[in-house]
């Protein structure tokens, strides 16, 4: 199991960011976390890389209790706000992340996000969508066993978004476990399984057909509202 989280709780002063979250993601699966902004998605992902320490619960990633340095080297993590060096070129940025993670071939990663032809461009001059794509390339350049993506396609045009999802599915088919957070319904529907999260609580999880059947609805948006208790 790539991710095993049981009863994870985290509180920031008056905010219960995570409230007894359970999550299980095997190798070879694209798992989507669907919820509005402030629902706990980012806190959960940050917990998985050791940036947030849960108050309670158990977290095991790639078979080890987190955080473990040797495990972190097998994880690719894309933050919601691209963490790039604006005064460096595209290829200098991805070379840096490849070295930090122990190596990797930058050309396939940049071609995956269609930035190979912009490799000499200064990162600070890129559009928001291009910076997002570069951040994704930096996360996957070392071919991680687990890929954690926090809102990975914000600002990316629909056609390229579909291509990126095709690429993520190909990575999963090769055994990579992928956890993707999103607040966009049609984006989340591309995942193999979904966890619906709100106010730090996992409302339900399953395939899209399973969630629709559970809520007795035909649309994922309606299912989310029903399971969240926001719709009679």
How would you name each of these model-derived features?
Residues 49:
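Helix-to-loop junction immediately C-terminal to a conserved catalytic motif
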Residues 205-206:
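ABC ATPase "signature
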């Amino acid at each position: 199991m790539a991710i095993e989280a049981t009863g994870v709780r985290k509180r920031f002063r008056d905010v219960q960011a995570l409230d007894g979250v359970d999550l299980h993601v095997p190798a070879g699966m694209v798992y989507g976390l669907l919820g509005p902004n402030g629902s706990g998605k980012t806190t959960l992902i940050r917990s998985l890389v050791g940036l947030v320490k849960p108050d309670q619960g158990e977290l095991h990633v790639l078979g080890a209790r987190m955080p473990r340095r040797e495990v972190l080297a097998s994880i690719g993590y894309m933050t919601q706000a691209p963490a790039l060096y604006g005064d460096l070129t595209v290829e200098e940025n991805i070379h840096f992340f490849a070295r930090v993670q122990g190596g990797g071939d930058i050309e396939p990663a940049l071609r995956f996000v269609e930035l190979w032809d912009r490799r000499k461009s200064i990162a600070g001059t890129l559009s928001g969508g291009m910076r997002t794509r570069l951040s994704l390339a930096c996360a996957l350049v070392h071919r991680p066993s687990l890929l954690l993506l926090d809102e990975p396609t914000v600002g990316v045009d629909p056609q390229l978004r579909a291509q990126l999802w095709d690429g993520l599915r190909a990575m999963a088919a090769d055994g990579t476990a992928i956890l993707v957070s999103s607040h966009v319904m049609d984006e989340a529907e591309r995942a193999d399984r979904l966890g619906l999260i709100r106010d730090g609580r996992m409302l339900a999880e399953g395939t899209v057909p399973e969630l629709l059947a559970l809520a007795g609805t035909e649309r994922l948006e309606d299912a989310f509202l029903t399971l969240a208790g926001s719709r009679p």
